[in-house]
Amino acid sequence: GIAQRPPASCSSAPGAFFRPCCVDMVEKAFIDANALLLDSYRLARKIFDDGYRPDYVVGVWRGGCPIGVAVEEFLRVQQCPIKHHTAIKTQSYTGIGQSREVEVFGLEYIVSKVDAEDKVLIIDDVFDSGKTVKAILEAVRGMARRNTPEMRVACVYFKPTANQVGIVPHYWLHETEAWLVFPHELEGLTLEEIGQKLDPEIAQIIQAPGGPFARAAEA
């Protein structure tokens, strides 16, 4: 989804596999890679137990894609008749009047396949403002028209107080207000944070000669 902005106040989600770290008075919750995979399967189980059987599974690039892969794998081994799985991309930009707008890319494949009787599961890592999901739903409706499928939204993390659109995901696991740092994320972190909160080996790997992390280590 769209990159998170540091919240005004934060608290870790109950039961979430976090390694919290407060930096500049903002709590960063570092999410363990294996815990995220397990949560992806838990999310899939929640969807399956609810009786929902999607025909299409759509991951939102970037964070929703690894979760979407796990969810799709789970549903397939449960013999759900999934027709297609794919990824779409969203991008935030400043529109007229300086409001933040969301553009959606890559919907052509799904829209060319779906019928009104189909079920589409849209998966992202975190639902915060909700603007990303709202833009996706509106874009599908605008392109598919009479063939608009039933669409449901699933995510691992939900930030209810950040919601700006009045819609909520159909499925989620954890509610949180923390600034989430996913296992693949490095940008915006210090070398110390990467070494202590992610993995010391990652901190060593990213110190490429001449790069900013190598210079930081030498300082």
Model-derived features with residue positions:
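PRPP-associated nucleotide enzymes
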Residues: G1-A219
